[in-house]
Amino acid sequence: MKPVVLTFLALVMSARAVATQRPPASATRPPFTIVVNNANPVDTLTVAELRRIFMKQQRLWAHGDTIVPVDWDAASQMRRVFSQIILSRSVREMAEYWVQQSVTQGLAPPSTLSSGVAVARFVATVPGAIAYLPPDAADRSVKRVRIDGLPVFPAQSR
């Protein structure tokens, strides 16, 4: 009986030690970075706010500017990942959402661009713009925004 209890305690302690270890920085890095125009005072957004913004349920920034979300082309991997993680929908489900919004609310989907350079250039020149970029594509022409509530992602193998 005593060896069973000791084995159980050892397992519990090992599990606790593993659970309290922080994952390496690469494991927590999201597959995209949210960016806004440098003049935008926003520093942090929640996943729920991003969802409302990219589904055009929130159309104004707190400081009064119109929000201009920019998406990637529907065929891009960036768009698929962003849609799944932030919008909790596939690209196809989002296309269906926009058909419904167009008919019932008169809303058009966000504009789409096909490259990180084009997305960054657009965000840098449009005051209310918001978009997502690969983490290494966000340069000083745009402002990175912290995402509160984003889940931890495993490191990607290269």
Residue ranges and their predicted role:
Residues V5-S14:
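Bacterial N-terminal signal peptides
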